[in-house]
Amino acid sequence: ESANDYRDSRNLLLDQLSTYVNVESYEEVDGTVSIYAEGQFLLESNVQHRLTTANESETSKLLKPVWEMGGDFFLRGELSYSSENDTDTGSLRGLLVARGKSKTTYLDIPQKPDESDYLDADGNLDSKAYFNATEEYNRKVEEYNENVQPSIVMTIEAEFDQLIHGIATMVNDTLCPNKKLTLADGTTITVLDTDKAPIGDDADKTIGAELFVRRETSRYTEKTVTVLDDDGKPKPVTVYQYNEENPNDHYSLYTTDQLEVNPELLRDPSKLPLSANASSGHVDGYTLDLCQDLLAKW
């Protein structure tokens, strides 16, 4: 009777284990049990092969199950559900799939190329460039579907970051509009459009103060560059060059974990650029059209 009780308890534990991971168990002739999990022995007769955890990568603090002896526990990929490959069983895999392998941002969501971005000054389409951009987009979609979409956490995180990025850049670009400037050597840079940009209501008439700032990257760098005047002669001008977002530099992105409300505006709200700039042609006071523009975009 005791032996049967032990056997029942063992079988119950095996049933519980099978809800966590996909296992196969075999009873040996001597009554011991061997357990096979994810292509390897978890229990080989009376020899137990233990699991532990390790970081997903050198840059991630997320944990994954690994064998103490070395090697990943899930050899056939954690971000996949497939009855054909027998990777649709077990709550542990389900949790790992839902969590994902890494943090995501708006950059992980593929952006379909806009045909209008590939038109020249005469309205002719650069078919080759547009085709290459479309091919790259399709490649990124496949990558997204394989590495991000299966994870609900990674998907929501990327979509939320895209929303935050869109709001932050929309507000900032309205308060601090930019323009392209051609330099004397023919290259172009992006600078603050000081003719159209509104100014603050403070004594210094602050210009170019964005509402949402990147913690490690300022919006502009003040510098002197050389341009050509109306007569084609070089002349130096002082500009506020926009510090572009760099996909390879996380600290340069308008992404959720890098954003904060401009501390300078919190200290002195009068610096928020909502007043008319004399160069813009607007009368003194608040730029009503700017406020209406913000509301329309919102």
What are these language model-derived features?
Residues E1-W298:
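Structural signature of extracellular appendage/secretion-system components
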